[in-house]
Amino acid sequence: MLEKQRSTAETFGIPLAVLLEITHRCPLQCPYCSNPVELDRSGKELTTDEWKKVLSELAEIGVLQVHFSGGEPTARKDLVELVKHASDVGLYTNLITSAVLLTRERLSELADAGLCHVQISFQGVEEGLADRVAGYRNAHRKKLEVAKWTRELDLPLTVNAVMHRQNLHQLPDIIQMSIDLDADRLEVANVQYYGWALKNRAALMPTVAQLDECTRLVEEARERLKGRLSIDYVVPDYYALRPKKCMGGWGRQFFNISPAGKVLPCHAAESITGLDFESVRSNHSIAWIWQNSEAFNRYRGTGWMKEPCKSCEFREIDFGGCRCQAFALTGDAANTDPACALSPLHETIFKQAEREAEGETNRFLYRNFAGGTLEPENDA
């Protein structure tokens, strides 16, 4: 069955790397959480055997890398078993983690099982601010400890720093922290404002001046640290003239699998109402879902586009921008992403971002299974 699907799936090219969100459970309460607004409960999660079947199928259809993510992937007791199975079927494995639940013993077990790489998220460099953003006491201290263990176990390390108005001033120190931790790579990822982050946009949106300085610092550090630290940079696009080529275009270069087994064109895709996403629990193979499912084909390519995207010279470069952002801001995922200057809403969101960035709102609506908790006023 899988062999029959291999050739058809290659029409769009099975991605070399796939994101596996094995759980939405997470001890952190980050206000910019990229998981769907409606989280999958633990009772809906794929079982160990189901995830093993997924891993075997991914390897068979040509996937080379899997990224174990969440939520917090270490919340699953079977993570070592899953990593070992992935390694056994020839997959490169990366753990994307907050690190706060890890012990040195368990990290060592993961390394012995074949884990190839660790990516740890950091909310800042100063413990008070970092723990406040995470909504979790002593998180920053634990992250530093786990980063040290990672290098002691000779595992490559990526530092993921999610940036916003309240921590952008720490970027020079974050770059230095990455060097001090002997990280191979730093991902400077500005918050993307959909899903839960949209609820906290007024507390997170940077000013234009902050973003310009952030870009300057990244460019300077890339040149200065060439060959020592690789730096990836993800910018927010509210202030841009052209939208980002989100995920390389819908259904073209990326898919992820949710805790409940849904195969998604991006981790925020379930925010678009009216789309039904196929599950690995269905009778269809993953390759069939990638190639033939209605959800993946809805916004794939350019045939779905309305004006001004339809006749735009950049339509096969940025593919109209982010479908999730278009839906969040306009109510129609087929509309031009308002980050684009050609969108009739572009000026509106630009001005709104400026107002929010200059505002005095700093309190977070924390992310949790209770539906969100507003940060106490005296803590903001």
From Swiss-Prot:
[4Fe-4S] cluster binds at C26, C30, C33. SMART domains: Elp3 (SM00729). Its EC number is 1.21.98.4. Binds 1 [4Fe-4S] cluster. The cluster is coordinated with 3 cysteines and an exchangeable S-adenosyl-L-methionine. PROSITE patterns: MOAA_NIFB_PQQE, RADICAL_SAM. Its cofactor is [4Fe-4S] cluster. GO terms for biological process: pyrroloquinoline quinone biosynthetic process. Pathway: Cofactor biosynthesis; pyrroloquinoline quinone biosynthesis. Keywords: 4Fe-4S, Iron, Iron-sulfur, Metal-binding, Oxidoreductase, PQQ biosynthesis, S-adenosyl-L-methionine. InterPro entries: 4Fe4S-binding_SPASM_dom, Aldolase_TIM, Elp3/MiaA/NifB-like_rSAM, MoaA_NifB_PqqE_Fe-S-bd_CS, PQQ_synth_PqqE_bac, PqqE-like, Radical_SAM_PqqE_MftC-like, rSAM. It holds the Pfam family Fer4_12. GO terms for molecular function: 4 iron, 4 sulfur cluster binding; cyclase activity; iron ion binding; oxidoreductase activity; S-adenosyl-L-methionine binding. It is an enzyme of class 1 (oxidoreductase). It catalyses: [PQQ precursor protein] + S-adenosyl-L-methionine = E-Y cross-linked-[PQQ precursor protein] + 5'-deoxyadenosine + L-methionine + H(+). Belongs to the radical SAM superfamily. PqqE family. NCBIfam families: PQQ_syn_pqqE, rSAM_more_4Fe4S. Interacts with PqqD. The interaction is necessary for activity of PqqE. PANTHER family: PQQA PEPTIDE CYCLASE, RADICAL SAM DOMAIN PROTEIN. This is PqqA peptide cyclase.
